[in-house]
Amino acid sequence: TLSELLKKAYDQLGELQLHPMITGSGGLALADNLHVPFIQEVIAETEAIDKEYPQADVIIELGGEDAKITYLKPTPEQRMNGSCAGGTGAFIDQMATLLDTDAAGLNEMAAQYETLYPIASRCGVFAKTDLQPLINDGAAKPDLAASIFTAVATQTIAGLASGRPIHGTVIFLGGPLFFMSLSLIHI
């Protein structure tokens, strides 16, 4: 909770002035109920990255239900996935279920892959259509796990970047990018 976080910050840092804000898809109602300011997620992350990592050129964020790429230079430009959760945390969770694991298990499996298979990344329904025959044919789970992460990376590059190069210092944000296998595929 916020109070626990503030106490922990106080215990570690002592007296300091804080200005907590709430962001995210469900944040506006929560901010109103708690009487805490709300800030748009893309503004919050862009300001934080600009302050902490001024050398950053691109931000790639994979959330639970959406994905964004923000080009910071030469002028800010943000792109977000459309109406489908393809290439997001929800997509990863859905695909992990098909392999009888969770996102962390998918990550562990992917580290041992040998072969990559093409899997649709735009939509979970299409990806499942690609994945199920591979499962039925006995494809190795590590190969399928890495193929799922490759589909996520492909969706980010093809769908969000849409031909614009991703170069320079890239900052990865979001829970799905916690998984090393996915981060390495993006690099």
Residue locations for each model-derived region?
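Glycine-rich phosphate-binding loop plus the immediately following alpha-helix
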Residues: 74-115
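Glycine-rich beta-strand-to-loop/alpha-helix junction loops that act as flexible
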Residues: 23-26, 168-178
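Phosphate/pyrophosphate-binding loops at sites that engage ATP/ADP/AMP, CoA/4′-phosphopantetheine
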Residues: 6-18, 156-168
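Conserved small/polar residues in nucleotide/adenosyl-binding loops
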Residues: 185-187
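Short beta-strand-loop/turn "lid" adjacent to the catalytic site in phosphate-handling enzymes
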Residues: 10-43, 70-79
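Gly/Thr-rich phosphate-binding beta-strand-loop-beta motif of the actin/hexokinase/Hsp70
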Residues: 56-73
